[in-house]
UniProtKB/Swiss-Prot annotation:
This is Protein pns1. Residues 1-35 are annotated as: Disordered. It is found in: Cell membrane. Glycans are attached at N469. One of its GO terms (biological process) is transmembrane transport. Keywords: Cell membrane, Glycoprotein, Membrane, Transmembrane, Transmembrane helix, Transport. The chain crosses the membrane at residues 82-102, 131-151, 159-179, 185-205, 228-248, 276-296, 334-354, 371-391, 433-453, 470-490. It holds the Pfam family Choline_transpo. One of its GO terms (cellular component) is membrane.
Length: 537
């Protein structure tokens, strides 16, 4: 593999070329064709000639020290998708401005909203009671997310089983609880979710050994190289801090601009309050929150991908890993690739906004007892979730390419997906459960946060929610906070696996030459590795 930016992989390399002295596993037939009986490939299919990446080592390879930028050089222009980076900065600055004004108005009339759970005289909007709820939600999300991260680190196979079972049990128990509380719409939705989780988990069982092996491989590498656990902890704490800031901003917007029918909101004495303004500002800060959270998540992912790429291509070289791989990968993600990371994050943020709107609508229908409406919005939410999964999958493998070679977002996505499809890596990706497992675990944490919000509102009975109008909104935001924090904590776990898959596709011969033990254990656990990845005829 080159130490220089590469837009193409070498289709002539395969996993069937062994070095002398290695035990040669039983040869598999050549599956790399487009015939239906041969995994959808045609025996007569031939790729046109593609330029091979240069094979020379980085300029300082034989010297005492070389860094990440020497190992993975990027071509000019070095900066890509600049418009997305500038737009991201503008949106974030707008968020800072809105937050500052809203929090100032909240602090100015804080007496109306109380200092604790029960002493508020605010009967028209969110208040300090809600702020304390979000503090509890943050603590629960932080504790569950970090415990989940430690579970992945120390109990790889058990981690997958426990995740699936907990989601099933929690979904069914929540559905039964809602029905017992006569919230039939929400109860039926959760029961359907539980049945769906059971079907998914049963289909997972044959693929658990391979997934557990890949997870353990990622964890083993992280213990020896890079700073995965430090990056995860710092990223998680930044996510918690931003979620706290967002929670204060959200409550402040309602306090500052929510009109009161009795005219009791002192913030509205000088005008400027309206329901439309509240909705507009909430939509804006929610979108900014999603975009920042996705950018943070993808920056962590790109950083970790750089570390695993360094391990895959250079750990067995005479001079070992490039010096400062973690710092070098982070520096590239926040400079040359800042625009590309912002672009990919923007797409996910838009989809998440649609899913959030659907979630709020579904909970409103459930609160009003509309079973049909609740189920319809749940089904729509499932389609949006599938779209989110597909785009996220597409994004994360593209970011692995961006981490190493610094290409623009769209060319990197096209090149990476073409390579993975032609190599057969997409088959391995589909059979690896780590992505769905981590998503399911994050959803579990978010449902715990949403349930906490519901119980808190039921037991504290704030005056602003006497008719239950704010229940769906508060639960939805508690769900989002739990989901984003857990996903950010767990990002480094999946990043290693995804980078290994991409690196295997770009240069499979490195796996044979530099990591033979890993390769042989992989084909023992999952023989389809030899069948899925073959050179073209």
């Amino acid at each position: 593999m080159s130490g220089q930016a590469a837009s193409y992989y070498n289709p002539s390399q395969s996993y069937g070329d062994f070095q002398p002295g290695m035990q040669n596993p039983q040869q598999q037939p050549d599956y790399y064709n487009n015939n239906v009986s041969n995994h959808g490939y045609d025996l007569n299919f031939q790729r046109g000639p593609e330029p091979k990446p240069p094979t020379e080592p980085p300029p300082t390879y034989n010297q005492a020290v070389y860094g990440f930028d020497d190992a993975f050089k990027i071509e000019r222009p070095k900066y890509h998708d600049i418009w997305a980076g500038l737009l991201f900065i503008a949106v974030f600055l707008g968020y800072v401005a809105v937050s500052g004004v809203a929090i100032h108005r909240y602090a100015k009339y804080k007496g109306l909203n109380g200092d604790g759970i029960y002493d508020s005289s605010n009967s028209f909007s969110l208040d300090t009671n809600t702020l304390i709820l979000f503090i509890f939600v943050l603590c629960v999300a932080l504790a569950f997310s970090y415990a989940y991260f430690l579970g992945a680190r120390y109990f790889s196979k058990l981690f997958i089983w426990v995740t699936g079972i907990l989601n099933i049990v929690f979904a069914l128990a929540t559905g039964i609880y809602y029905i017992a509380r006569k919230q039939y719409g929400g109860g039926i939705v959760f029961l359907l979710f539980g049945v769906f989780a059971i079907i998914c988990f049963i289909s997972w069982i044959p693929r658990i050994p391979f997934s557990a092996f890949m997870l353990q491989t990622s964890i083993d590498v992280s213990r020896k190289y890079g700073h995965m656990f430090i990056v995860s902890t710092i990223g998680g704490l930044v996510a918690v801090a931003f979620a706290a800031w967002f929670s204060v901003t959200l409550v402040s917007i309602y306090v500052a601009y929510e009109p009161s029918s009795s005219g009791s909101n002192p913030s509205c004495s000088d005008g400027g309050c309206s329901r439309a303004r509240v909705i507009g500002l909430v939509v804006y800060v929610t979108f900014a929150m999603y975009w920042f959270s996705e950018w943070l998540k993808n920056t962590i992912h790109t950083t970790i991908a750089g570390v695993y790429g360094s391990w895959y291509f250079w750990s067995q070289s005479p001079n070992g890993m490039p010096r400062g791989s973690t710092r070098g990968a982070f520096r590239r993600a926040t400079t040359y690739s800042f625009g590309s990371v912002s672009f990919g994050s923007l797409i996910i943020a838009i989809i998440n906004m649609l899913r959030q709107a659907c979630s709020v609508a579904q909970r409103n229908e459930a609160a009003e007892g509309s079973i049909v409406g609740s189920i319809m919005f749940w089904i729509l939410g499932c389609f949006i979730a599938i779209l989110d999964w597909l785009v996220t999958l597409f994004n994360r493998y593209a970011f692995c390419h961006i981490a190493l070679y610094g290409k623009a977002y769209i060319p990197a996505a096209k090149d990476t997906w073409t390579m993975m499809r032609d190599r057969g890596i997409d088959a391995l990706v589909n059979d690896c459960l780590i992505g769905p497992v981590l998503t399911m675990g994050s959803v579990f944490v978010s449902y715990v946060c949403a349930l906490l919000a519901y119980l808190y509102l039921q037991f504290t009975k704030p005056s602003y929610n006497a008719d239950g109008n704010f229940t769906a909104v508060i639960m939805a935001f508690a769900f989002v906070i739990g989901l984003q924090i857990c996903q950010i904590f767990m990002t480094p776990v999946s990043s290693g696996i995804e980078t290994i898959f991409v690196a295997m596709g770009w240069d499979p011969q490195v796996m044979i030459r530099d990591h033979p033990d890993l390769y042989y254990r992989m084909i023992q656990v999952y023989p389809r590795v030899q069948q899925a990845i073959q050179p073209s005829a």
